[in-house]
Amino acid sequence: PELNCDEFANIEPRLATPPQLFHEYTVGWSKLCLDKPEIYDFVATVLGEMAEITTGDYLHIGGDEIEDERYKEFVVKADSIVRGLGKTTIGWEEVTQAQVDSTLISQRWNGKTNSVVNTPIIESICSSFYYDHANIPGQEMTNNWCKEDGVSLKDAYTFKVKNPNTIGVEAPVWTEMVLSNEAADDRFWPRTIAMAEVGWSEDENKDYKNFIKRLGEHGLRLDLMDVHYFRTPEVEWNSDRNKGVFSEYMPESRW
């Protein structure tokens, strides 16, 4: 579970700056007021409750898209709170600008942070793994701020792990434009299959043409499982469903 510290901080308006309750989609402007000592009591309480109700070993403190002169101090304290609960901290890559503990796991989304501490890494580079982005150029109801033409199946599969500290990969899907289970399937599949093969394969053992050939053999299986996957045009699917559930959102020239 992730507690978004501290950019997405409107969950408690009294501790946020500015105090207006925000209910739209834009990000990058709200933050916890780090001058207030009560902030740490609040964060400790919420993280403590999260630790009690979850069985996993990790708590995610967020920490991206914020600029504050006390940011590094806050991140170090938040990391300490998580470790005090017997959990391992995960944070977006910006948290490694601070002298956090070396056990913290950095989740990279753009790879541009100048880290001052050597930590394990989860690769979630947006140009390969942000699956709220379009499957192909022009797909409606998708984001494109990281990669204008979308994050293709090939973008996902051809990602190369270059850092020896990498312990895994993860593909986030933000759901402000995912309004149904079918839409979620469209975002996840088949790109998640490509991501899985990235996670368990050495780069030299990957071959995209071979992958899409093997992938096509699972079309009928996915249909029978009622998975509303995006029917990537370059894959020769072995099923009769000619179009994906969201084909109406795709340029006709792509088919």
Q: Predicted segments — roles?
A:
Residues 99-104, 109-255:
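Flexible, acidic glycine-rich loops studded with aromatic residues
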Residues 50, 78-82, 196, 219-222:
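Hydrophobic, Leu/Ile/Phe/Ala-enriched alpha-helical segments that form helix-helix packing faces
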Residues 1-81, 95-100:
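Aromatic-lined carbohydrate-binding surfaces of glycoside hydrolases
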